[in-house]
Amino acid sequence: AAAYEQPELDEGTIDTADASSLAFKEGKKVFETSVMHNSEGTNALMSNYGIARDSGNLTFSGTSHIKHGSINANTRQDAKIIVFDKESDGKAMPILRIDDNDVQASHAAVVGRLNEQHLFYLESRGISEDDAKRIIALGYLKPIEEFFSDEEVLKMIDSAIEGGI
């Protein structure tokens, strides 16, 4: 399990945590992220995107805690997982702990099978099923690259994505 505990957010702090992951070949990945709003006017965004395939198991767990005295705090959690086959599993577990009023807190969690209509559309354009699945997977995982500028790191990310798809 990979755990990321963000520091307590002080007044006016803006924090983001973004993750993209691929669980495959009977691999099990668990990501736990937490953030604590400790004073007023703080902002946090957690975004998690992943794919489970080939008997892979992927779990995203996020906890956002807005403590008493943190008015005007804003926290949001987003998690999306595509499950490519019946042997694989995905779980998204957003947790919001709200101890004050006059705050904004929201979450969205989507775990679902590969959209057959998307697959059909690509195949109707002459793309093989394997290539169509690869294109969909790349579209899901590649956005993480926007957070990196180092060419070597980007090559490593591309290689990891290509090798797992």
Name what the model sees in each region.
Residues 140-150:
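Short arginine-rich
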